[in-house]
């Protein structure tokens, strides 16, 4: 029942929210937000297991698929679309699906989250298989769309995980791994786009970033698979080469172009003083890990 969920409880500290000054409202929000990272910290071990599962999928050329409704679905899509420019992935490697389809990203689609079959249809449309990992996201932990998606994922042998903001969440029954970040009552009762949404974003950041590190998308703490899709990222790419090799801006820029704007290859070329083709071979042999290629 909805009233039993901690995310639906009234926050005792903000009973007079409508009477607070603007500054008091902001201070209350800030105070509550401080608790979110601590709540996430309690779930690190579970998040680690999820990351290990995602890495295994990636190593087997499987995909990471997020499913959710409302804010939860939007956060999954947000994390997914950041992976290609940040980590050089193709747009199929990490995907996000929201109840009601992409139009629901900007406008609520009434009743979509209550239909389990919609998630099954979404996952069937991409040929979900046993190599993939599906992560269901729901602050309440009871969204039918997410439950339907997790059920279907299990039926085809895909790995499954859930992210919710209540303990003993309903969706946890349908996923092998469960991340339950108990964020408690919101300052505005039931508005889970607040602390619960923040917690979900933090967890998704962890999962995608740690998984990409696990498949060689990072060298030291540098995003060496960054895609130079605009002038800012072109400059960042050159700076990454400089940081990784100690080369001057001019040398970094030269090798960046020699490597056909492949940052990883440019780093290997500078440090090993080799040609582009040899750098690519070394990276291929090292499965994309710069450190191993060196």
Swiss-Prot record:
Domain SIS: 54-217
One Pfam family matching this protein: GKRP_SIS_N
Disulfide bonds listed in the record: none
Pathway given in the UniProt record: Amino-sugar metabolism; N-acetylmuramate degradation
Enzyme class: lyase
EC number assigned by the record: 4.2.1.126
Matching Gene3D superfamilies: 1.10.8.1080, Glucose-6-phosphate isomerase like protein, domain 1
Biological role stated in the UniProt entry: Specifically catalyzes the cleavage of the D-lactyl ether substituent of MurNAc 6-phosphate, producing GlcNAc 6-phosphate and D-lactate.
Membership in a protein family: Belongs to the GCKR-like family. MurNAc-6-P etherase subfamily.
Family matches, as NCBIfam families: N-acetylmuramic acid 6-phosphate etherase, PRK05441.1, PRK12570.1
Assembly mode: Homodimer.
Protein name: N-acetylmuramic acid 6-phosphate etherase
Gene (UniProt): murQ
